[in-house]
Amino acid sequence: NVQINNKNVKLYRDISYGKGMPHRKLDIITPADMSNDTKLPVIFWMHGGGFIAGDKQYKNQLLSRIAEQGYIIVNVNYALAPQYKYPTPLVQLNQAVKFVKENKHELPIDFDQVVIGGDSAGAQLTSQYVAMQTNEDLRDEMHFEQQFKPSQIKAAVFFGGFYNMKTVRATEFPRIQLFMKSYTGTSHWET
């Protein structure tokens, strides 16, 4: 496990959420001096790794610096491709959000101040998740249950992701074919 050396935060590691898939663990990082009397905004984060690699623990050091500013961080792991294909990580993010909401009595989370974000593949995943939370037609097409009203999502942070499947191949990003074929199960992933 990657250790975080930050006395200003508390780390609750490897909390199980959901059932039936691997990597269904999340870490929660809170300010060390958090009081249950004051609700704090929450950030849901998903790591990168081209859908085929990566782990939540590698972002905990960075996310701990954000938590010490007065945020509760929920850092979500997800099942990796090629064994688990699209939309498995999105289903898992929805399970993680639902788990945290159902156990909200344990943390002073202000669910009217939600931030959703990720890096690289996690940015792509969370961008699609935010779109599903704010677009009823897309949510219905994907058969997802809405967890947040658009007014509850105060910000989205998409760091280094890709968002337009029709143009991403043209970027010639190294190994994009491997990542996307592993994740979608097809060579024709743009459509």
Over which residues does each language-model region extend?
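Alpha/beta-hydrolase superfamily serine-hydrolase fold, recognizing
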Residues: N1-T191
